[in-house]
Curated annotation (Swiss-Prot):
Binds 1 zinc ion per subunit. The active site is at residue 169. It comes from Caenorhabditis elegans. The gene is nas-18. Residues 73-262 form the Peptidase M12A domain. Its cofactor is Zn(2+). Keywords: Disulfide bond, EGF-like domain, Glycoprotein, Hydrolase, Metal-binding, Metalloprotease, Protease, Secreted, Zinc, Zymogen. This is Zinc metalloproteinase nas-18.
Length: 410
């Protein structure tokens, strides 16, 4: 069967009054378990004018993209602590500096509320306690890692006004390191330190005292952008996924594990979800799943319909073509993610270049199969063929991610 999906997502028209990172629309395509998920990103914090021509030159970068090419360079002093130090409790004290604009305050408060809605971590404004984070307008976007019993600066200038970057720096203050500083990072990245300047070298240091609690997540908001001369994923299909700034399911798992966030009674959440420690009556679901127990696709919108069950079948998708996708060093502007991997929680490769995905086929270990599109603005079109094959999912072995007990088809 063939399907063509067309979506006009001018985020400015319906999201300018919010700081929401995404808005979800699931549309049932055809008569199989395929769901098309449009994520319209909020361009209140994007540095892009939807009505202006989008540059195609790799040198014509927006402020935020230029910031990615410098890898969100921390500018803390050379004595910046390298060991992750968790705050003594799940409460982070902060104070807004007088230099911090109203817009940045609103974004930071929204980002804090997002983290609190997914974890047991809370934030309290307190400008008198020494052990606090002082949010200041300064050079670049940076934060110490963990708390150090001092008034420490979280620097957030005008190139940082973005939800993913705000969460990134707050997670640093909460003790979370960069993904590419994990002990096992060399299993997933090729890094050429000869091309890294001395002042940037600390950004590539491995934390020997760190503890991994989730699989390596190329899509994490804690991961820097890929650069062929310095850092590139060993799974090359992830080259445009690194650094897009999307806050992932596993990002919040890190915080919940680090702070031992739990509910008195655990719900039986489906599809890899888990009980929300901030609201114990519901589950936190991987992107694309909904319901109180994450037991169904998250259908939002009119006339979405219901899928025809094709139980125990592998679904195959072939992308015929993508149109009006803008390919930059990352899929920051827009991207297509086909959830074909067995773990519904992990970020799959995200594509925004027709040269890399047109004609490419995927066989999914998930049924139903989810397809995610995120976009800042514009009209994106995806045309694909899909079918189910005679091979059965139950013929595959089940495995776990090595960090928890949830099983999925390998």
């Amino acid at each position: 069967m063939c399907a063509s999906c067309l979506h006009n997502a001018n985020a400015a028209s319906f999201l300018m009054e919010t700081f929401s990172r995404h808005r979800l629309n699931f549309i049932c395509i055809g008569k199989m378990n395929i769901f098309y998920n449009v994520t319209s990103l909020d361009n209140k914090y994007s540095f892009h004018n939807p009505s202006a021509p989008v540059p195609h030159s790799s040198h014509a970068l927006s402020s935020r993209q230029a910031h990615f090419t410098s890898f969100r360079a921390p500018v803390a002093p050379p004595s910046r602590p390298r060991r992750s130090q968790l705050p003594s409790s799940a409460k982070l004290l902060y104070c807004f500096d007088s230099s911090f604009s109203t817009e940045k305050r609103e974004l930071m408060l929204f980002s804090m509320n997002f983290i609190s809605s997914q974890t047991c971590v809370t934030f309290e404004e307190n400008c008198s306690i020494p052990n606090r984070v002082q949010l200041v307008n300064g050079k670049g976007c940076s934060s110490y890692i963990g708390m150090n019993n001092i008034v420490q600066h979280l620097t957030f200038n005008d190139t940082c006004i973005d939800f993913g970057t705000a969460v990134h720096e707050l997670m640093h203050a909460l003790g979370v390191i960069h993904t590419h500083s994990r002990l096992d990072r060399d299993n997933f990245l090729n890094i050429n330190l000869t091309n890294v300047s001395k002042e940037m070298m600390h950004n590539y240091a491995i934390f020997n005292q760190s503890t991994n609690v989730v699989p390596y997540e190329y899509g994490s908001t804690m991961h820097y952008y890929a650069n062929i001369s310095t850092m590139f994923p060993k799974k090359s299909e992830y080259s445009a996924t690194l650094g897009i700034g999307r806050v992932t399911f596993y990002d919040m798992v890190i915080l919940n594990t680090a702070y031992n966030c739990k509910c008195p009674n655990e719900l039986l959440c489906g599809n890899g979800g888990y009980t929300n420690p901030s609201k114990c009556s519901e589950c936190i679901c991987p992107l694309g799943y909904g319901g109180v127990l994450c037991d169904r696709p998250s259908l939002i919108g009119k006339d979405t319909g219901l899928p025809l069950e094709v139980k125990d079948k592998i679904i195959e998708v072939k992308v015929v073509g993508i149109d009006n996708f803008f390919s930059y060093p990352t899929c920051l502007i827009n991207g297509l993610e086909i959830k074909y991997m067995g773990d519904p929680r992990i970020t799959n490769p995200i594509y925004c270049s027709a040269d890399l995905i047109n004609g490419k086929s995927f066989r999914s270990k998930l049924n139903p199969l989810l397809m995610n599109i995120h976009t800042l603005f514009g009209k994106n079109k995806v045309t694909f063929h899909y079918r189910y094959v005679t091979e059965r999912l139950s013929g595959y072995n089940k495995t776990t991610n090595g960090y928890d007990n949830y099983e999925y088809y390998d």
